[in-house]
């Protein structure tokens, strides 16, 4: 009976840790997505500024 309790406790601990890791993974994926969106926005802004500078030079 005691072995069964020890095994159940180990399974619960494993389950809890796995849930924590899944949550951390989701946070990392979200941060990665946000970084990509930020980089894309910065590239768009840089392109817009470059176009404006080119137009100003040609005027």
Swiss-Prot record:
Component of the inner kinetochore constitutive centromere-associated network (CCAN) (also known as central kinetochore Sim4 complex in fission yeast), which is composed of at least cnl2, cnp3, cnp20, fta1, fta2, fta3, fta4, fta6, fta7, mal2, mhf1, mhf2, mis6, mis15, mis17, sim4 and wip1. This is Inner kinetochore subunit fta6. It is found in: Nucleus; Chromosome, Centromere, Kinetochore; Cytoplasm, Cytoskeleton, Microtubule organizing center, Spindle pole body. The keyword Nucleus applies. One of its GO terms (cellular component) is microtubule. It comes from the Eukaryota. Keywords: Cell cycle, Cell division, Centromere, Chromosome, Chromosome partition, Cytoplasm, Cytoskeleton, Kinetochore, Microtubule, Mitosis, Nucleus. Component of the kinetochore, a multiprotein complex that assembles on centromeric DNA and attaches chromosomes to spindle microtubules, mediating chromosome segregation and sister chromatid segregation during meiosis and mitosis. Component of the inner kinetochore constitutive centromere-associated network (CCAN), which serves as a structural platform for outer kinetochore assembly.
């Amino acid at each position: 009976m005691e072995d069964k309790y020890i095994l159940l406790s180990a399974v619960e601990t494993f389950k809890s840790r796995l849930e924590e890791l899944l949550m951390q993974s989701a946070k990392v994926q979200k941060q990665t997505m946000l970084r990509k969106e930020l980089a894309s926005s910065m590239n768009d802004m840089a392109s817009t500024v470059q176009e404006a500078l080119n137009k100003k030079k040609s005027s």
